Amino acid sequence: MTKRTASIKRQTTETTISLSLNLDGTGQADMCTGVRLFDHMLSQLAKHGLFDINISANGDDIHHLVEDVALTLGKAFNEALGERKGIVRMADATVPMDDSLASVALDLSGRGYAVMDLSFAKNDLTGFPTDLVRHFLETFAIEGRFNLHARILYGSNDHHKAEALFKALARALDKATSIDPRREGVAPSTKGMLEN
C-alpha cells in the first residue's frame, strides 16, 4: 500500500505553518501553535484518530492562526487520501467526556461541507474563543473536502464539550480513512470515483 502522508508548509503575511501528517500512524502528536488549548485539542485529534501529526505554527493573531492551521490540516488530509480508493468513506462517533456528549458524522466524499450544532455557555475557553471551534471545524472540512456534521448533545463544562467533540471527530476520521480490504483499489462510490 502506498504511504498516505502529506507535508505542507504555508507562509503568508499573517501566519507561518509547517505540518506533517501520516494517516496510518500510531497517534503521535507534536503540536506547537503557541495556544495551549488549541495544541491540546489538536493532540486529541492525533491520539484518538491514530494519526501522526506534527504542527509548528505561529501567527499575528489567534483567529488567523486557527484558520490557517485548519486550512493546512485540511489540505494535508486531502493530499494524504489521494484518490480515496479503498477507504471506508463514511463514519460516525459519539464520545462522552464526564458531563458532556458530542457526536460527529462524516463522509469523505471529496465535497467539503459542514453543519454544526454547537453550544457553549461562555465565549472563551481559557483564552481560546469558542467561536473558533466552529470556524476550525468548518474550515478543516471544506479544505479536507469532506462532509462534516458535528453536534454537542449536552454538557455543563465547555472544555469537556470541546474535547468530546475533537475526540468524536478523531474517532470518526479514523474509521472513515481506514482501508476496507474488500474494496482495495476501488473508489467507494457508484460513480467509480471520488473528487479530490
Curated annotation (Swiss-Prot):
GO MF annotation list: imidazoleglycerol-phosphate dehydratase activity
Keyword Isomerase appears in the UniProt entry: no
Gene Ontology CC annotations of this record: cytoplasm
Catalytic activity: D-erythro-1-(imidazol-4-yl)glycerol 3-phosphate = 3-(imidazol-4-yl)-2-oxopropyl phosphate + H2O
Cysteines engaged in disulfide bonds, as pairs: none
Enzyme Commission code(s) on record: 4.2.1.19
Chief subcellular location: cytoplasm
Pathway(s) of this molecule: Amino-acid biosynthesis; L-histidine biosynthesis; L-histidine from 5-phospho-alpha-D-ribose 1-diphosphate: step 6/9
PROSITE patterns listed in its UniProt record: IGP_DEHYDRATASE_2 (PS00955)
Keywords noted in UniProt: Amino-acid biosynthesis, Cytoplasm, Histidine biosynthesis, Lyase
Subcellular localization(s) per the UniProt record: Cytoplasm
Pfam short name (any one): IGPD
Tagged with keyword Amino-acid biosynthesis: yes
GO biological process: L-histidine biosynthetic process
EC top class named in words: lyase
Stated family: Belongs to the imidazoleglycerol-phosphate dehydratase family.
Record's protein name: Imidazoleglycerol-phosphate dehydratase
Gene that produces this protein: hisB
